[in-house]
Curated annotation (Swiss-Prot):
GO-annotated cellular components: Golgi membrane
Pfam families linked to this entry: Sulfotransfer_1 (PF00685)
Keywords for the protein's UniProt record, in alphabetical order: Glycoprotein, Isomerase, Membrane, Signal, Transmembrane, Transmembrane helix
Signal peptide coordinates: 1-20
PANTHER family xrefs: DERMATAN-SULFATE EPIMERASE-LIKE PROTEIN (PTHR15532:SF2), PTHR15532
InterPro entries: Chondroitin_lyas, Dermatan-Sulfate_Isomerase, P-loop_NTPase, Sulfotransferase_dom
Similarity field: Belongs to the dermatan-sulfate isomerase family.
Protein name in UniProt: Dermatan-sulfate epimerase-like protein
Transmembrane segments: 764-784, 803-823
Enzyme nomenclature, EC number: 5.1.-.-
Gene Ontology molecular function terms on file: chondroitin-glucuronate 5-epimerase activity; sulfotransferase activity
Length: 1212
């Protein structure tokens, strides 16, 4: 029967209302980043949710959940061929169950069943039932499963006695029991069918009632909700075939919640889950099942969800070398709770389709530990075998991802996690490092909670990050794959268990007084509803790799109580080689801070290898771990050289349903009045560290000299990282750290280059003063020898004095040459100190000097250049300025600058001869003294004259209003527009208050500027960084003519602009054929003179003329000042393209900016004005919607330039 629901339609209507009332500007998203769930598509596609597929309707009642009866024979054949390895795993699981029925069968008595956590019984039923379906001849197994289900159906309920408020065990039991019932339906007698079905009905009804009152019914993206909703859906689907409309209500409830889940997951651009890998595998198990069931039963297609496309990396990039252990962010065991082989084969079959999922599932199964703490729990190890069998696609040949075999850095910008060396075999050279500094709930959830774009989200009440840890700025280190520093995994939420800093004495300490760690600690679950905890956040400042060197840093001050009066808790990690890790803590506190002590912790869970005290070079205290005579060492010191002894402790903590042992090194430092800096060095057995010390510790940053394997490395790290000018001054570029050694300097985020001089430092083997003293002593000794000779051999006094004079002159000359070659200062007594100090500052800036960037963005209107705002918006490094706006307008010049496009090129000679003085002064003011320029803008209420001017500027748009609205209404509307523009100026001013060194980014809306970049070059000089955005002419013309109603072509009044292009109006000068006219526009002028020219032809000639002229004119600009960027590259390859743009600017791409551009290009949740949603699919929508004759016309006109830019022909 067709299942239609008014309730579901009501849900859609509420969603439409919620999105229609969403504010324009949200969090780190610009005013164009409007969250939209593609309501039109939602309506057309998802109102059919409850219309079962006709195929299912016509087939037998059961099985129908994951497959129908007609597929069983094929599944049995696969068990002997392509699926043999999975069948063997299922058969092995069943053999183990049959060998120990006392353990695996549900207890005969309900009291025993309810006495402990009992998810094992629901989890093991589906693979057992699938085996019986594949091997109906195995009567022993079938009798076993009947006894299994008879016992479960005989219980009065499936609750756990000591957890009466937790329905998760019921959810597992219901999912398993209903799935097994569906699989075995045709093998059961009628009595059992009816009895089992009644039990499923009763339990499903209970779950539905619980969903209305329990927190899991409201808390999204949480493992409890996903688990219980899948249970409710499974029960509804199984009973709904036989029972009526009540089951449909249950289905509706699940779909409403799970579609919200999928919608929110789409905001998470990196495929992660905030609950960590272990619980993430738990939630993902249910999400993949929902996606499959929703498509199979309701025709709901979520396979384009961006989170699913990225979720593979959540498993691959968190794996330590050897494929057995994962990084344990948040509550975790050593790897996964459920799967992840099932999730991986699902992703491969339906999303990736490249064999990578099958390959990783294969590696994980191959390397599964047979014993020890990393063995999967008996309650969970087989729970996803049935879905893995059903989803496995043998046609996808297992193959690793691209670049497999080389250690790579992977950044999860939403999660706030960086890993290095993941997904590799366990060999001596494969090292793993992880770093965590993220926002509570992940960036997307955090922003949604704080900026409330959706009315159906009730702040933190709609989420449950209770499994997260107080772990901002935490890290792990496994040189050679041997875990040296690990997390403490599942346990109480205490900061000292998470390798982060704690402080004392703190007035707000809630446990371990007087010490206090990060917000939300001190309980079994993170107290995310506590005071200030909802605002807790860390931030990864930078993450970059060059060769085997990695630099990562994070700020965690917002994760600590404001009562501690901390200004910065900045931690930097530098992996120098596969076995040497330098960790630096920079702590800055306010003058009235009560804190005077800081304590660091480093954990290891491996009971076989214990930490013992160690002393480095009899100078610094440390600790060592002996792994079969291989020594892994650490030591520490502050910027004064202090190195206190550590306390090495062991502890047992509650974890899941057991105790887990841990050990940790705890070292406490006394803090300085304002700034405290501490360095920790971790290194493996094949490394010789011979010295390590601070050589600079100033306000902007620090330098550490570290001698590793007889090579000196000078590490420079900026701690005033928000200040771009400070970074340029301290390092010579816009990054955050550099490493110099004898011959090269590595600038993290930009690259490595050779340096002319070897590293020089203040330890000089033969200083000048020492040489001078040696020379004087040598002269005296030789003089005494000569006197002795004179006395012994009676030499004449005259001859003696001649010899002495010659000797003195010779020695003086030699000393003079030595001074000439070494002394670089006028007063040589200061040579050693001055040169040493100078070397500190020059080490990092050795080589090519870079200027602070002044960014200019230009393009033809409609080319999508506005998307670059996502790279620069809400950044401490940049101030994104739209030009023009009501208050930032371009002054008039000798030549008119058309607001759409013109054909005038400004030559260097014209600029240098004194033209455009007013415009030149305006630009210098806006760029070089931005703060003063903005302050001098008077934000007064616009008078009638200003309104009239505004009307004139927008006359095309206003004609529409005049037909519909009265003059007072128009004035009111214009006043509102001016109010928005005034608030825009105030926002720019506020940004400069927080980040005074932010560099301006001028986004020029007129296409006229594409031919005038030489003007910016002359005014701004070497600091100019021009980004010229081009777009496929077919996509551009489609966007201009068809992508919005009314079209951009009409709104911009393009025909009028083109008609004015070659005219002279009102005495205003225009460039002509003899002066400043770009000759590429001549074909367009001829086209305009034709009476039958159409819009497509005109726009094609316009694109060709403007683009060709811009490419010719801008060829003269240096590659360091000008870069062409294709809009399609930004959308299709956002990370690669934006990294190239930021390298051009001399600044590393931050994870926050990366997250913003990924959100804008990958989620279908971001749109540009007149453009609609931005996604790789939508950039090619012209291929489906643009008439073929128009495509051919565009290609005929533009082909030469299209080919040069790399745009292929479509009509071929």
């Amino acid at each position: 029967m067709a299942l239609m629901f008014t309730g579901h339609l009501l849900f859609l209507a509420l969603l439409m209302f919620a999105f229609s009332t969403f504010e324009e500007s949200v969090s780190n998203y610009s005013e164009w980043a409007v969250f939209t769930d593609d309501i039109d598509q939602f309506k057309t596609q998802k109102v059919q949710d409850f219309r079962p597929n006709q195929k299912l309707k016509k087939s037998m009642l059961h099985p129908s959940l994951y497959f129908d009866a007609g597929e069983i024979q094929a599944m049995r054949q696969k068990s002997r061929a392509s699926h043999l390895h999975l069948f063997r795993a299922i058969r092995s699981a069943v053999t183990v169950m049959l060998s120990n029925p006392t353990y695996y069968l549900p207890p005969p008595k309900h009291a025993d069943f309810a006495a402990k956590w009992n998810e094992i019984y629901g989890n093991n039923l589906p693979p057992l039932a699938l085996y019986c379906l594949l091997c109906p001849e195995d009567k022993v197994a079938f009798e076993f499963v009947l006894e299994y289900m008879d016992r479960m159906v005989g219980y009065k309920d499936w609750l756990v006695e000591n957890a009466p408020g937790d329905e998760v065990p019921i959810g597992h039991s219901l999912t398993g029991f209903a799935t097994a019932f569906d699989f075995l339906y045709n093998l059961l007698d009628n009595h059992r069918r009816q009895k089992y079905l009644e039990k499923i009905w009763v339990i499903t009804e209970e779950m539905y009632e619980y969903s209305k009152v329990r927190s899991w019914g409201k808390q999204l993206l949480h493992n409890h909700q996903a688990t219980n909703m899948i249970a409710l859906l499974t029960g509804a689907l199984v009973t709904g075939v036989d029972k009526g409309s009540k089951a449909n209500i249950w289905k509706q409830a699940v779909v409403d919640v799970m579609e919200k889940t999928m919608f929110l997951l789409n905001h998470i651009v990196d495929g992660s889950l905030d609950e960590g890998v272990a619980y993430g595998s738990y939630t993902a198990k249910s999400v993949t099942q929902y996606v499959f069931l929703a498509q199979r039963h309701f025709n709901i297609n979520n396979l384009d969800n961006n989170w699913l496309k990225m979720h593979f990396w959540f498993y691959y990039a968190t794996l330590l070398p050897g494929f057995q252990r994962t990084v344990g962010i948040a509550d975790s065991n050593y790897n996964w709770f459920y799967g992840p082989e099932s999730q991986l084969v699902f992703l491969d079959k339906f999303i990736l389709k490249n064999g990578a999922g099958n390959w990783l599932a294969q590696q994980i199964r191959k390397h599964r530990p047979k014993d020890g703490p990393m063995v999967p729990s008996t309650a969970q190890r087989w729970s996803t075998l049935h879905t893995e069998y059903i989803w496995y696609d043998p046609q996808l040949t297992p193959q690793p991802p691209a670049d497999y075999g080389t250690a790579k850095i992977h950044t999860f910008p939403n999660w706030g996690v960086v890993t290095y060396g993941a997904g590799l075999p366990n060999t001596q050279t494969n090292t793993f490092v992880s770093f965590k500094s993220g926002k509570l709930g992940g960036r997307a959830v955090y922003d949604i909670v704080h900026f409330q774009p959706y009315s159906w989200i009730d702040g933190w009440r709609s989420f449950n990050p209770g499994h997260e840890h107080p772990d901002q700025n935490s890290f792990t280190f496994a040189p050679n794959g041997q875990v040296f520093v690990s997390e403490a995994l599942y346990g109480p939420k205490l900061s000292h268990l998470n390798n982060v800093l704690v402080f004392a004495p703190s007035p707000s300490s809630q446990c371990n007084k007087p010490w206090e760690g990060q917000l939300g600690e001190c309980a079994q679950w993170l107290k995310w509803t506590g005071e200030e905890v909802g605002d807790a956040a860390g931030e990864i400042i930078t993450a970059s790799q060059h060769g085997e060197m990695v630099f990562v840093s994070g700020e965690a001050v917002s994760a600590y109580s404001s009562a501690m009066r901390l200004k910065s808790v900045y931690r930097a990690l530098l992996l120098l080689n596969s076995q040497t890790l330098l960790v630096v803590d920079h702590i800055e506190r306010q003058e009235d801070s009560p804190i005077n002590s800081v304590s660091a912790f480093f954990h290891n869970l491996d009971i076989d290898f214990k930490y013992i005290p160690y002393k480095f070079m009899n100078r610094y205290n440390g600790a060592m771990m002996d792994v079969w005579d291989a020594h892994y060492k650490m030591f520490w010191f502050d910027h004064h050289g202090n190195s206190p002894m550590a306390s090495i402790q062991e502890a047992e903590q509650a974890a899941e349903f057991k105790k887990r042992w841990t050990q940790f090194v705890n070292v406490t430092f006394q803090m300085e009045p304002t700034i405290t800096r501490i360095a920790y060095v971790f290194y493996g057995p094949y490394i010789n560290v011979s010295s390590c010390r601070f050589i600079d510790s100033s306000n902007p940053g620090l330098q550490i000299s570290l001698n590793v394997n007889n090579t000196e490395h000078v590490v420079s790290i900026v701690t005033d990282y928000h200040n771009l000018k400070t970074r340029f001054n301290y390092l010579g570029f816009g990054g955050f750290a550099s490493v110099a050694d004898q011959g090269q300097i590595t600038r993290f985020g930009l690259g490595t280059q050779a340096i002319v001089k070897p590293v020089r430092h203040d330890r000089i083997i033969f200083p000048f003063g020492f040489k001078f003293n040696i020379a004087v002593g040598l002269i005296l000794c030789i003089s005494l020898v000569i006197l002795t000779f004179q006395w012994r051999f009676y030499l004449s006094f005259r001859k003696l004095m001649r010899w002495i004079l010659i000797l003195v002159i010779a020695l003086w000359f030699i000393e003079l040459l030595d001074v000439w070659s070494t002394c670089s200062q006028p007063i040589c007594a200061k040579w050693t100190r001055t040169e040493a100090e100078g070397s500190k500052k020059s080490l990092s800036s050795e080589g090519h000097h870079m200027d602070l960037p002044d960014v200019v963005i230009t393009s033809l209107p409609g080319s999508g250049a506005e998307i670059l705002k996502q790279l620069f918006f809400n950044s401490s490094d940049f101030l994104y300025i739209r030009v023009p706006t009501a208050y930032i307008d371009i002054p008039e010049t000798e030549l008119e600058i058309d607001s759409f496009v013109d054909a005038c090129e400004w030559k260097v000679s014209d600029i240098r001869s004194g033209h455009f003085r007013l415009l030149r002064g305006w630009l210098q003011s806006l760029v070089q003294d931005t703060k003063l320029h903005l302050q001098n803008i008077h934000l007064h209420e616009p008078n009638r004259g200003k309104l009239a001017q505004y009307f004139a500027m927008n006359k095309d748009k206003k004609r529409k209003f005049k037909r519909r609205e009265s003059l007072p209404e128009q004035r009111s509307q214009m006043k509102g527009a001016f109010d928005r523009d005034a608030e825009y100026i105030r926002a720019l001013r506020r940004h400069l208050v927080y980040y005074p060194s932010a560099r301006p980014v001028l986004s020029l809306s007129s296409g006229s500027w594409t031919l005038k970049l030489h003007f910016f070059q002359e005014v701004l000089g070497a600091s100019m960084r021009a980004l010229y955005i081009v777009r496929d002419p077919r996509a551009w013309i489609y966007s201009m003519l068809y992508n919005s109603k009314p079209s951009l072509y009409s709104l911009k009044n393009v025909p009028e602009h083109l008609a004015k292009l070659f005219k002279i109006e009102g005495g205003k000068g225009k460039c002509n054929l003899n002066s400043g006219y770009a000759f590429e526009y001549e074909p367009l002028r001829k086209e305009l003179s034709k009476s039958k020219s159409n819009a497509v032809s005109l726009l094609s000639h316009l694109w060709l003329a403007n683009t060709a002229a811009a490419l010719r004119i801008n060829t003269d600009l240096l590659p360091t000042s000008y870069q062409l960027v294709k809009f399609e590259d930004i959308v299709h390859f956002p990370q690669k393209t934006t990294e190239r743009i930021f390298a051009f600017l001399g600044i590393p791409l931050s994870p926050a900016s990366l997250n913003q551009i990924l959100f804008a290009t990958s989620t279908n949740l971001f749109y540009l004005p007149y453009e609609g949603e931005i996604s790789p699919t939508n950039t090619n929508v012209w291929k489906q919607n643009l008439p073929r004759d128009e495509i051919k016309l565009i290609e005929n006109i533009c082909w030469t330039l299209m080919d040069r830019l790399g745009y292929p022909k479509f009509m071929d």
